[in-house]
């Protein structure tokens, strides 16, 4: 299984290791990441589509060689677990029956057998957390945990909880945390590092010399959409009603003057009302009802402005179903005359929002130009998935299907893991050429041929924005088109996502420069001793390849020095260098390093491990 073909040379170098099957392409930035990951527990940040998985294979191979303990790779969904197992069985040079899935789909009593038999376990985090907590498994039997999509390791997420358990119960375990986007704030990045016991940061940037030969062109286009007068007329009574309710809450003193109503402002008003109720202020109870109605109306208006009429009606239909279970607040909201009149008028008008037809035209044009194209459409909402799937199915040559999560939502059932995997295979093979997906499709989709990604709306998260764009331009040029409805939440979200992404990369650079994570191990430790690189029948060591490629590519793609860069360099010269911390002191809970497998005086291995 060869990765992207090398663009500069006809000869493709490949990695040679006793526990790897031939075919892993050697890339300098991946070898650099490998060296960091084998030196100490590492957070690897690499753009989507540049082969984080290949680094994971190489790290697993070396741990198979060095130790007899188990290796766990954690992925957020059962679908990704199955995908990781399939790829690892193709690439790892061990008995495929020793690479097993460990998920909640297997009963607990059978998981015990899987744990005992498996050498490499592909797992979901919840099952590892639960079984480790219940002492069904011991994390002390593990030498390495790879956290794929590691940005989840914050707060009470199962990723973070597994990290806590691993650090508390395994003194010598290594961690490799892999992600394209660890978080937009320093706090989020550092929390991931802390929860997973990270000693070291490895960051690969798309525009750096080592990645340039493998970068394919990605076109990012934003399509601004004006709301038609017919839609504005339909929603005007709803907006007027909301404005009156907001004024009432402001007169009661629970909300200040606002230019644009946001979810945060509504939440702050709700908190103010809660404090009033705790003081036994009788006004609080009436205000609480009004604020709840304002929140529901705010959500409805956002849907109508950014998604369309059908999405708004689906929202109200779902609320009506919830109201039948006895939710008095929902029933009160739906019984308002303004809502009743809106539902009657909207059902008679059909879809008024232009986004759906814009998507229809773009899909039709792309498929008519190239029937072999693959198009991936992302949206936040399942009802939009349903509407788009029905709309696109009427276009000649379009073979469209939906891709949603496993949980059920209202009347709509989720997809099973088997259905998800089958759908991806159909998309990959061309049986389906248009896939309409919710956020479940953002992480780790193994779809190398999506030439066009349509984002029905922008997303505020830098993480999710990066992942959506990463679904295209993996092996050939691709296009990302984002639909933004003017004068709506879309515009704010679009600007916020760009700002957060810039901030994320700046924070990574600051953290690395300040030495808050990075540690440089002793040069005597030859972590790549078992890796060779074969080029046109000849072999060199991985270290030699890394040095030669780095020199070659830095000459081929020199860094352009700008005035801003010069000024930054001057400013940095006056900064006090960060205090260096020893590996022994910095490692959490006496965590071992690969340096302990080598003689301190000679730098040679102390003992040789044999394969199982």
Where are these regions (language model features)?
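Walker A/P-loop NTP-binding motif
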Residues: 31-42, 50-67, 87-90, 163-168
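Conserved Walker A/P-loop ATP-binding site and its immediately adjacent core
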Residues: 48, 53-58, 68-90, 129, ...
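SF2 helicase catalytic motif II
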Residues: 125-176, 183-188
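Conserved RecA-like helicase motor core of SF1/SF2 enzymes
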Residues: 143, 405-409, 433, 439-467, ...
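Helicase motor interdomain insertion/brace
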Residues: 158, 162, 189, 203-212, ...
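Conserved segment of the helicase C-terminal RecA-like domain
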Residues: 471-498
């Amino acid at each position: 299984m060869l990765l992207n073909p090398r663009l500069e040379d006809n000869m493709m170098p490949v990695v040679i290791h006793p526990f790897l099957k031939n075919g892993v392409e050697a890339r300098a930035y991946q070898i650099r990441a490998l060296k960091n990951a084998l030196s100490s527990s590492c957070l690897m940040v690499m753009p989507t589509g540049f082969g984080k998985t290949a680094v994971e294979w190489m790290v697993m191979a070396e741990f198979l060689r060095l130790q007899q303990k188990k290796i766990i790779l954690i992925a957020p969904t059962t679908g990704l677990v199955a995908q990781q197992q399939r790829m690892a069985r193709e690439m790892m040079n061990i008995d495929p029956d020793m690479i097993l899935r460990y998920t909640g789909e297997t009963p607990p009593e059978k998981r015990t057998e899987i744990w005992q038999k498996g050498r490499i376990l592909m797992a979901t985090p919840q099952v590892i957390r639960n079984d480790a907590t219940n002492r069904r498994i011991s994390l002390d039997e593990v030498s390495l945990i790879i956290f794929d999509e590691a940005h989840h390791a914050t707060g009470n997420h199962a990723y973070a909880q597994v990290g806590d358990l691993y650090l508390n119960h395994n003194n010598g375990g290594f961690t490799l945390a892999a992600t394209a986007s660890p978080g937009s704030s320093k706090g989020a990045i550092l929390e991931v590092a802390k929860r997973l016991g990270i000693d070291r940061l490895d960051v690969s940037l798309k525009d750096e010399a080592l990645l340039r030969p493998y970068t394919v062109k990605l076109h990012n286009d934003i399509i601004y959409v004006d709301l038609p007068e017919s839609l504005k007329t339909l929603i005007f009574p709803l907006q007027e009603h909301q404005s009156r309710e907001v004024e009432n809450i402001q007169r009661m003193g629970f909300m200040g003057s606002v230019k644009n109503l946001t979810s945060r402002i509504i939440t702050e008003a709700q908190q103010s009302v809660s404090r009033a109720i705790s003081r036994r202020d009788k006004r609080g109870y009436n205000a609480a009802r009004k604020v709840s109605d304002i929140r529901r109306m705010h959500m409805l208006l956002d849907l109508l402005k950014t998604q369309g009429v059908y999405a708004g009606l689906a929202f109200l239909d779902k609320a009506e179903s919830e109201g039948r279970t006895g939710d008095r607040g929902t029933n009160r909201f739906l019984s308002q005359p303004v809502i009743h009149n809106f539902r009657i008028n909207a059902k008679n008008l059909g879809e008024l929002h232009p986004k759906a037809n814009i998507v229809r035209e773009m899909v039709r044009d792309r498929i008519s130009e190239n029937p072999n194209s693959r198009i991936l459409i992302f949206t936040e909402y399942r009802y939009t998935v349903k509407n788009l799937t029905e709309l696109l199915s009427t276009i000649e040559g379009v073979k469209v299907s939906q891709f949603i999560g496993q949980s059920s939502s209202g009347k709509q059932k989720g997809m099973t893991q088997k259905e998800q995997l089958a759908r991806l295979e159909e998309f990959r093979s061309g049986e389906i050429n248009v896939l309409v997906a919710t956020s479940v499709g953002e992480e780790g989709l193994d779809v190398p041929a999506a030439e066009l990604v349509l984002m029905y709306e922008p997303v505020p998260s830098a993480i999710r924005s990066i992942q959506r764009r990463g679904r295209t331009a993996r092996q050939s040029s691709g296009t990302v088109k984002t639909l933004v409805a003017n004068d709506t939440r879309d515009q704010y979200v679009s600007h916020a996502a760009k700002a957060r992404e810039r901030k994320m990369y700046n924070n990574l650079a600051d953290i690395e420069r300040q030495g808050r994570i990075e540690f440089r191990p002793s040069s005597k430790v030859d972590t790549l001793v078992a890796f060779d690189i074969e080029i046109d029948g000849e072999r060199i060591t991985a270290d030699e390849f890394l040095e030669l490629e780095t020199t070659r590519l830095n000459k081929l793609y020199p860094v352009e020095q700008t005035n801003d860069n010069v000024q930054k360099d001057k400013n940095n010269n006056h900064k006090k260098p960060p205090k260096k911390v020893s590996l022994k002191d910095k490692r959490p809970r006496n965590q071992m390093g690969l340096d302990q497998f080598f003689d301190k005086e000679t730098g040679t291995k102390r003992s040789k491990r044999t394969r199982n």
